Amino acid sequence: MNTLVLIPGRKSLRYAGFVAGSETCTGTIRGFRWQGPRAALDEVRTIVQAVGLCDDVPDVVVHGLFGGEDFPGPAALDQDALVRLERVARQSPLHVAGLIEIARAVQEVFAGMPARLAFETSFFVDLPLRERTYAVSPDLSHKLALRRWGYHGLYHEAASREASRSWRKRDCAPSPRILSICLDAQPQIAAVMGRRPITVTSGATPLEGLPGETNSGEIDPAVALALAGEAGLGPEGANALLVGESGLSGLVGRRVRLDDVLTSARSECVRAREVLLYRMLLASGTAAAALGGVDAVVFSGRYFSCSAVVAQHVLPHLDRAGALGPHAGEWTIFAKPLETVLADTATLH
């Protein structure tokens, strides 16, 4: 089975081709928003045809960040999906409008090839009511579609699936309590019971939660109001600061990556690391409490190679608190990149 994975970003389009599960080509089309999705996809098609990916009609998988409650799982990219995306775009216009544009271009450039959409939020559609609900008026929540989401659902779902499989091989209970830690540009922690998430660190947007590479993470709303008002930044300026100039980069004073902060001996990185690891400890404790204990710990994400740094800081605290089961200290790594996780959705669903 051949699969073409497309991951549109704000400025670039990543692609990867797979034949029988093995990656045959990968690359990035930069400036694709400027040249237009049709031109970028024409370029991708030329590349994948040259390596023989189209010799056997491939499945095309398009990555989406936000799918709302309309997309509880991967969905065929057809007219019905586009109608639903238009509806979802009212909730998250920044995330979805560009996806609609590229989805239409996929239908044109890869006409006749089966295509599907896979969303990061799908895994979190069924978060428990107590977890997804904000303490504001239900009428207002409904009107504005306010609720909590997770934004690394593809990693969390794949990692917890593998952790559950390993757990069952031990002849243990069928629904392990999993602490899933995704180490990415915007790190995220989720508590998963078997295959269902019950808590997650992010919220209505990725701004809530742990500090990221440029994202402040959870912050008192009054701070945002002060930045917009007293500091004179205005709403757009405050948002730009909290989303693009804060987090680990804000603490260090220059643009940094998560792995730099977790491994560097520079004093400014050490300070940022202390803040991040403390927040991760608190979030892990919350997840463990919600689960009633932890049977398995699994790491995933772009920076999974830094898992040991986090594990050595967080897990001893959980163990002393009596939150870890007999095998939870034997943490594991789910090392597949996002491109492979997306390719797997073509066969798993």
Per-region residue spans from a language model:
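Glycine-rich phosphate-binding loops at beta-strand->alpha-helix junctions
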Residues: D295-H317
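Short beta-strand-loop/turn "lid" adjacent to the catalytic site in phosphate-handling enzymes
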Residues: V51-L99, M113-R116, T121-T133
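Glycine-rich phosphate-binding loop of actin/hexokinase-like ATP-binding domains
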Residues: D126-E230
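Phosphate/ATP-binding catalytic cores across multiple sugar-kinase/actin-like superfamilies
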Residues: A158-E162, S166, R271-G292
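Glycine-rich phosphate-binding/hydrolytic loop that grips phosphoryl groups
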Residues: S305, D319, A323-H349
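A mobile "lid/hinge" subdomain adjacent to the ATP/sugar-phosphate binding pocket shared
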Residues: E230-E274
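Phosphate/pyrophosphate-binding loops at sites that engage ATP/ADP/AMP, CoA/4′-phosphopantetheine
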Residues: T46-D59, S166-D171, S284-D295
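Short glycine-rich, Thr/Ser-proximal phosphate-binding strand/loop in the N-terminal lobe
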Residues: L6-A39
